[in-house]
Amino acid sequence: MAAWSPSVGIGSCCLNNGITRTWKFPSARLFTGRKNKIKLGSETLMFTRKRFMGDLVTSALQSYQFSKICASKTSIELREALSSRRAEADDLKKVTSYSFRTKAGALVKVKVEKKREKYSILVYVSSLELSGDDKSRLVMVWGVYRSDSSCFLPLDFENSSQDSQTHTTETTFVKSSLSELMLGLEFDGKESPFYLSFHLKLVSGRDPDGQEMLTHRDTDFCIPVGFTAGHPLPLGLSSGPDDDSWNFSFFSRSSTNVVLCLYDDSTTDKPALELDLDPYVNRTGDVWHASVDNTWDFVRYGYRCKETAHSKEDVDVEGEPIVLDPYATVVGKSVSQKYLGSLSKSPSFDWGEDVSPNIPLEKLLVYRLNVKGFTQHRSSKLPSNVAGTFSGVAEKVSHLKTLGTNAVLLEPIFSFSEQKGPYFPFHFFSPMDIYGPSNSLESAVNSMKVMVKKLHSEGIEVLLEVVFTHTADSGALRGIDDSSYYYKGRANDLDSKSYLNCNYPVVQQLVLESLRYWVTEFHVDGFCFINASSLLRGVHGEQLSRPPLVEAIAFDPLLAETKLIADCWDPLEMMPKEVRFPHWKRWAELNTRYCRNVRNFLRGRGVLSDLATRICGSGDVFTDGRGPAFSFNYISRNSGLSLVDIVSFSGPELASELSWNCGEEGATNKSAVLQRRLKQIRNFLFIQYISLGVPVLNMGDECGISTRGSPLLESRKPFDWNLLASAFGTQITQFISFMTSVRARRSDVFQRRDFLKPENIVWYANDQTTPKWEDPASKFLALEIKSESEEEETASLAEPNEPKSNDLFIGFNASDHPESVVLPSLPDGSKWRRLVDTALPFPGFFSVEGETVVAEEPLQQLVVYEMKPYSCTLFETINTTA
């Protein structure tokens, strides 16, 4: 084969020929044998008759006549078939066939065969009539290229000529005994991979310049050598059937050119090889694909995409940025911190007998945490390579157990922009590398699996916050196919932002494949979809009542056992957007109304009807075929004020936070203010854990972590483990643990799949009258929850073998004065016992055994209990005759 190399003069249109190392082709020399003559360019070449590649027991042809331009390393061979016999290749793995049609209807077949470190290319043309004159002949005008199909690489050989401007060579076909035209070329395998590109020229005495013949698509014929066309599915990187090759598959509808960039060194930014994929051979529909032998020492890969909007004169192919494969499951950084796909498989992991805890929705007790912030602080006392990683979370499982947690909700862990934070991902199939002990993706993948396995063994599920509605501004899907992935030119309010067009088919597929991957590869138990309201946008930005993606997720068979939660908080606007979310009885929701109404009540601004609705499971949202368990109830979250700041800051700039500083802004030494704040924190937690639905506790709220009144996400501080030993941390942690145990013990009330029956609830104002539901001045509410009969418990699917339920009485006083509460009368042999009074000192404001309350006067039948200002109480009946 004639040589091409950066060391040879190659013209301005080829900067590096797709290679960074020097692959030098030495000059060729003429090989003489039996003196038959054939025209190659302007030179008369001598060729010899001999058998092609020896005994072709496994070849498509058995004998040939050929001419050869030989060299010490490479050669070009021209062959003429001597026999009419052709057999199918026995070893199909080494033979690749391609078929084309010309616009005139002629059939062009090409076979590429690898044998003995050489590539043989046979080109056959049939259904073509040559004119009768003796000068009529068919010529193949060909060249080779790698990184740029518009620029052939120069061939350097002796005693033959090549067009010095186009670097093309002309070779004449010979007629075989099967009445078809044929020619053959041979290349040294060491110089692959590359493309052989050619067109045909029909020359006759009447037309010595020749009539050009292209494919029926008006393109040159293009054949990959040293690699194959590959397969369009699955998208991303996959291994061949015998693990002997890598298949690359990449979607881009708008690109006119896609270049596969391969790196043989992870410490360089320059690809070792670039292959400009042919739109005829390497494209099926909108998917570009190729298969490369894995014996090459390539370690990373990426793509360059050139869209229709640019002509070849506008932007050079090498000027396009190299983009990451959206479906790559193993990624790594280059020297410039650019992320590229890795040519390696995910390391095997021994899951052993790992099984998801598969906890019913109504039984969940969720703890939301940031992987880095949870153990990053030196107070975690973890090694530096473990702190702030998945491994760090696994090391602190005992704290989660202490709180009664049975599910962790991890803030986004997909690879994200370090400048903008975890809510701006650039990739959907890999965890962020900083969460691995060695800050590498490989360690992040392994340590995450270890974490999931550890949490599962402790009965704790793993839920992921995921962001599929927008991406980081750079390094994500930008530059691949913006008109398909984004709202490019479709929705004015979304066009300038990095909003993904989620209900566009190709984006739907990406999201579904990502979710399936995290479930199958990492054993994730569920997903919380951030900015879920944007999932309801159509392909032109319109609101959909039945969005295809949301429905597809709900009914996907691989996701059937996972928990699906919609969170309508928008990281771009830093605020929630309330919508009526379609659910198909599968989707739960992070309940923003719950947060707002509870905050309003405890700061004295809400109405009783709102509080009652939230306590009983938000029937205004979830009576549509779901139930209270589909309501994920939170008081604070990672954006906005932390729990301790909700009761400490309420400046004008924090109006949207619905907070109250309890009498003084910010830090204070006033005992009365501090006591009021402590009671309010207890009240928030009390209401959260006695409400029907799933309580979601935010990281750090159990120990009073503050951002000094900043609602910004970036103001969040790492978890300070020393605070757990403080007086505040001790009592609040114990209180949360107590409340989770109450929920478990009284699951018939607090962990229900269905709503409480109206006949089992009695509501009271402070004087045992009917509450004034819509009066903003009413700040006291109480309810009695009557135990269900045995038949009712069975009908409500209560857990078997649970202790018999007793009546409950719950009081809420958001006023600044005490309220005297008359507890409902009980039959003989029953009494009320107080389990919680948030106004009492610690220890004592909650009790497992409870404290029996009796009438002040022996002859008095009714029990009157004084509730202090800003307090909540919980009473339960006990049988005193047992």
Curated annotation (Swiss-Prot):
Phenotype of the disrupted gene, per the record: Strong reduction of the starch level in leaves, but 50-fold increase of water-soluble polysaccharides. No alteration of the amylase-to-amylopectin ratio.
Any GO molecular function: isoamylase activity
GO terms under cellular component: chloroplast; isoamylase complex
CDD domains, alphabetized: AmyAc_plant_IsoA, E_set_GDE_Isoamylase_N
Span of chain positions assigned to the transit peptide in the UniProt entry: 1-70
Keyword terms of this UniProt record: Carbohydrate metabolism, Chloroplast, Plastid, Starch biosynthesis, Transit peptide
Superkingdom assignment: Eukaryota
Chloroplast listed as a keyword: yes
Parts of the chain that traverse the membrane: none
InterPro entries in the record: AmyAc_plant_ISA2, GlgX_Isoamylase_N_E_set, Glyco_hydro_13_cat_dom, Glyco_hydro_13_N, Glyco_hydro_b, Glycoside_hydrolase_SF, Ig-like_fold, Ig_E-set
Gene3D superfamilies per the UniProt record, alphabetical: Glycosidases, Golgi alpha-mannosidase II, Immunoglobulins
Compartments, as annotated in UniProt: Plastid, Chloroplast
Signal sequence annotation: none
Description of how the protein assembles with itself and partners: Associates with ISA1 to form the heteromultimeric complex Iso1 required for amylopectin synthesis.
Purpose of the protein: Involved in the trimming of pre-amylopectin chains. Accelerates the crystallization of nascent amylopectin molecules during starch synthesis. ISA1 and ISA2 work exclusively together as a multimeric holoenzyme. ISA1-ISA2 removes preferentially branches that are very close to other branches.
Similarity annotation: Belongs to the glycosyl hydrolase 13 family.
Stated name of the protein: Isoamylase 2, chloroplastic
Organism from which the protein derives: Arabidopsis thaliana
Taxonomy of the source species: Eukaryota, Viridiplantae, Streptophyta, Embryophyta, Tracheophyta
